[in-house]
């Protein structure tokens, strides 16, 4: 283990510092500054190398966290990245974007602040790229089998890389003009700059993975054509159908889904031309939804120069500390101050949106009421209505499932009652040879779950093609996080 008394010597949890707010809202660069090596080493040394490391079960990938904490404490960065890559294809994604359920399961977190696992993880991969320790791993021989992966988000990329490395010829189909899916166009650069995606794609190309951009499966090429052309097809199209709010005034000009705001904004940052971009400069903005997507809209609006930004959440403000009904090692719901919240804006809880109001077809405000709980339901309380002035509203209410994209009509793939592509215990749909991984089959979830499912689905595909597999399968389709709502 690392320092046997490290958790006693260093009791303070010291996370990665953020750049000053007045500086960072003037650009789109990542908000975090580098952490000093000595601080990082001390934080890694707080790991107790538990006999039963609950951080493993908290992470869907089963990351070998105590092992690479120990290696960082011993200044063995090259060995650390080998242990990290053994379970995680893309630690630069999870190290920046994951809410770190592993830290919620850290044994030290029972009576001290948890180990800064996420920060150690991202430092390992950043150091590895800087020192040239990340290299292509092409297969020694080809199997002669072909696989099409549809969608280039975290699940699709993980599945493609795993299948390529065991010798299958893999082609990734992406309807957008660049690879990355959610990572490319859904996540603002201030959370993760896109060079992180680009260099992984280059690694995958050197390993032999092929990429087909600008191809919409279901229209440009049918699912049936893919199934005939390839020995297996993996559906990794994500859960992209946004949850709507069908209340009076929904059709007013100025009410938009969050992704209709974020995707063009990310394209502009990438230097791509965008027509009729939704821009928040000088506008009064209201965001409905208090999750990560809402925070992404908030940070983007700050950088656009919004006059004001208010986030409305229908539920109660979460507690600052773990509630009694969410005991360790479950993943708790906590009040958090993301970088975007630190930059400004107001957050209002127990706010039920009842109507979008406007004049001449344009949004002028949002009518809200206080939320009351009746028979377990959240309802607007009569007599508490008020109108908040607004020029723009962004609906960041989550996603309800995968887009059909012709998959039912063309290959008879079925959907479950939650809007996800149905699959069996081996990630296969009801159509033989067509598999599904990530949010398309699981529903809206975390990037770390998408990568884990991509890896596990790759193992299932490899076994389907070859009769056996050496690929790891960290999760089953029915696995869920340990949580109490």
Predicted regions, residues:
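Phosphate-coordination loops involved in phosphoryl transfer and adenosine-cofactor binding
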Residues: 143-146, 214, 281-284, 350, ...
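Local cysteine-cluster metal-coordination motifs and their immediate loop/turn environment
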Residues: 45-67, 89-111
């Amino acid at each position: 283990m690392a320092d046997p008394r490290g958790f006693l010597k260093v009791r303070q949890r010291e996370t990665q510092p953020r750049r000053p707010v007045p500086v960072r809202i003037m650009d789109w660069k990542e908000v975090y500054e580098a952490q000093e090596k000595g601080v990082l080493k001390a934080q890694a040394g707080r790991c107790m190398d538990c006999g039963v490391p609950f951080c493993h079960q908290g992470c869907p990938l089963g990351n070998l966290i105590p092992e690479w904490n120990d290696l960082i404490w011993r200044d063995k960065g090259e060995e650390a990245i080998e242990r990290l890559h053994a379970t995680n294809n893309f630690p630069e994604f999870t190290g920046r974007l994951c809410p770190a359920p592993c830290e919620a399961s850290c044994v030290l977190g029972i009576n001290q602040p948890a180990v800064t696992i996420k920060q150690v993880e991202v430092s390992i991969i950043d150091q590895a790229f800087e020192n040239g320790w990340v290299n292509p791993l092409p297969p020694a021989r080809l199997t002669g089998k072909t696989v099409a992966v549809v969608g280039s988000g975290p699940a699709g990329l993980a599945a493609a890389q795993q299948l390529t490395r065991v010798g299958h010829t893999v082609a990734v189909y992406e309807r957008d003009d660049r690879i990355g899916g959610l990572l490319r166009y859904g996540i603002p650069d201030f959370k993760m700059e896109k060079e992180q995606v680009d260099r992984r794609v280059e690694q995958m190309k050197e390993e032999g993975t092929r990429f087909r951009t600008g191809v919409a499966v279901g229209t440009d090429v049918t699912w049936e054509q893919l199934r005939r052309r390839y020995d297996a097809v993996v559906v990794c199209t994500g859960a992209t159908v946004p949850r709507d709010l069908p209340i009076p005034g929904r059709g007013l000009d100025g009410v938009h889904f969050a992704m209709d705001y974020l995707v063009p904004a990310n394209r502009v940052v990438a230097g791509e031309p965008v027509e009729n971009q939704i821009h928040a400069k000088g506008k009064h903005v209201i965001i409905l939804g208090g999750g990560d997507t809402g925070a992404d809209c908030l940070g983007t609006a700050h950088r656009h120069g919004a006059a004001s930004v208010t986030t409305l959440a229908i539920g109660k403000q979460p507690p600052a500390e773990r509630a009694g009904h969410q005991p360790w090692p479950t993943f708790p719901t906590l009040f958090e101050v993301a970088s975007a919240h630190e930059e400004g804006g107001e957050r209002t809880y127990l706010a039920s949106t009842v109507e979008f109001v406007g004049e001449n077809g344009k949004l002028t405000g949002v009518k809200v009421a206080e939320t009351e709980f009746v028979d377990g339901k959240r309802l607007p309380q009569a007599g508490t209505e008020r109108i908040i002035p607004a020029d723009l509203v962004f609906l960041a209410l989550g996603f309800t499932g995968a887009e059909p994209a012709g998959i039912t009509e063309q290959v008879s793939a079925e959907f479950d009652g939650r809007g996800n592509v149905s699959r069996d215990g081996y990630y296969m749909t009801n159509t033989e040879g067509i598999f599904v991984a990530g949010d398309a089959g699981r529903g809206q979830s975390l990037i770390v779950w998408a990568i884990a499912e991509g890896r596990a689905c790759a193992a299932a595909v490899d076994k389907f093609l070859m009769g056996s597999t050496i690929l790891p399968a960290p999760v089953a389709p029915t696995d869920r996080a340990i949580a109490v709502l």
